[in-house]
Curated annotation (Swiss-Prot):
The gene is iolB. Pathway: Polyol metabolism; myo-inositol degradation into acetyl-CoA; acetyl-CoA from myo-inositol: step 4/7. It holds the Pfam family KduI. NCBIfam families: myo_inos_iolB (TIGR04378). It comes from Bacillus licheniformis (strain ATCC 14580 / DSM 13 / JCM 2505 / CCUG 7422 / NBRC 12200 / NCIMB 9375 / NCTC 10341 / NRRL NRS-1264 / Gibson 46). It comes from the Bacteria. This is 5-deoxy-glucuronate isomerase.
């Protein structure tokens, strides 16, 4: 199995709290992005202290209460399945704070991390504040929910977005990359993809490759998998009959999403 592909686990952290994914610097090729997925039973709680990191708590499914012990946001979360296709609530917590999560119902939560030293206010990112975009045409159509885009100054380095791709379509396509710290032409951003499929037995294909092919991995990605993108192009293809959801987390030295298309395939934009 590719070292860029992670399968879901079910490691019990405490009563009612299971760690599904943990991508961190020490177990990946990433230097900026870290990522966790937790499953919480009703009434269970999870706490964590942040040092030189900021975190976006995304209520993927179910309802939770989140707190930084100064502000508390009760009963947040809007959906039982990501395929209800409506935005959800999230909470931004800055560095040097402690946060807690309590599950009101059965819940799945994503924790998205990046470096931060300039403490910013804790913020509830309401579902209705997510910017919704429809991108692409032909067989390259997808719907985007912007949770923490680069136009929102609420975070220091973290970018978070949800993407839905229809049956038979491609996403992150034409293949693009953001692995050069060369603004204004291109920014350096690492990235993770947390994938879900509808129906759940489906799969998508994701290729991660660089110009020199020092990275060139094509993966069969199943429901609940995570793909790590330390560098390179990273398109996703969705087979007929299935709908793709993924949660993207990006971070790098500058909080700007400026990508570069693969010149071999950029011609499709001219159709």
């Amino acid at each position: 199995m590719s070292h860029l592909l992670r399968k879901p686990q079910a490691n019990e952290l405490s009563q009612g709290v299971k760690l599904v994914h943990e991508v961190k610097k020490s177990n990946s090729d990433l230097s900026y992005v870290e990522f966790k997925v937790l499953d919480l039973a009703p009434g269970s709680s999870y706490e964590e202290s942040l040092s030189k990191q900021e975190c976006c708590i995304v209520a993927l499914t179910g309802k939770i209460t989140a707190t930084d012990h100064e502000q508390t946001f009760e009963n947040i979360g809007t959906r039982e399945s990501v395929f209800e296709r409506k935005p959800t609530d999230s909470v931004y917590v800055s560095n040097d704070r402690k946060f807690g999560i309590t599950a009101v119902t059965e819940a799945r939560v994503a924790l998205c991390y990046s470096p931060s030293e300039n403490q910013l206010p804790t913020k509830l990112i309401k579902a209705e504040d997510n910017g919704i975009e429809n991108r692409g045409k032909f067989s390259n159509k997808r719907t985007v929910h912007n949770i923490l885009p680069d136009s929102d100054p609420s975070a220091n380095s973290l970018l978070v977005v949800e993407v839905y791709t229809e049956s038979g379509n491609w996403s992150s396509y034409p293949p693009h990359k953001h692995d050069q710290d060369n603004l204004p032409e291109e920014s350096f951003l690492e990235e993770t993809y947390y994938h879900e499929l509808d129906p759940q037995q489906g799969f998508v294909f994701q290729r991660v490759y660089t110009d020199d092919r020092s990275i060139d991995e094509t993966m069969t990605v199943e429901n609940g998998n995570v793909v790590i993108v330390p560098a390179g192009y990273h398109p996703v293809g969705v087979p007929d009959g299935y709908t793709s959801y993924y949660l993207n987390v990006m971070a790098g030295p500058t909080r700007k999403w400026k990508f570069h298309n693969d010149p071999d395939h950029e011609w499709i934009l001219e159709r």
